[in-house]
Amino acid sequence: DPEMSRGLGDVYKRQGICNRLDRNTSGIVAAGKTMNGLQKLSAHFKDRTLNKYYICIVKGEITKRQLVNGYLKKDHSCNRVTIYKQLPDDILSDKNMPANDKNTDKSEYMPIETEYVPVVSNGRITLLKIHLITGRSHQIRAHLASLSHPLAGDYKYGDASFNQYFADKYFCRNQMLHSYEIDIPDMNIHVHTDIPASFINVLKGEQIWQPGIPEVLEALH
């Protein structure tokens, strides 16, 4: 709804909020208490001179740290993004690409970079800490889904049977994605949240919760 979007945008501006989260994503939202603080914070978000970390629960087992790159293209008509591994030139010359996409402006393919490290896994699921290097719309959700590791509870990019399992067993209705930590070295700012109770409930239910996980998450960068 364009009118609602404009209204929400006005609210964000009035409250001095610098970043937005995907709908149903929990966690840290940064805001400036003063105009000077807001300007400094906003500049760091714009210039990407800060580090943003998320935690999420995904399908399958991930055993090692990965830095993955690609390109993201958003379809505004349905508020959904598609991830491509290839460069735009390669995509636009691909014979298998849908005809209605062949004349798409290359600038619509935005470069993305996502780093993730596994914290704990039982083979069925993995708890990840994500370093969101670029901050595109739906980036974490779509990028991991494209790698066959969709987020639990993600009804836009996820796996239907996997989501149903979490809905039935853990009453999970939203994607298990949480903005966990922000680090701004230039401003000597480092903040992180507690692990959400919904995450702990799942990890305990899957018998992989360990008391030392909060300390592990804090140490991983």
What residue ranges belong to the model's regions?
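Glycine- and acidic-residue-rich catalytic/RNA-contacting loop of pseudouridine synthases
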Residues: R6, L38-K40, V58-T126, A142
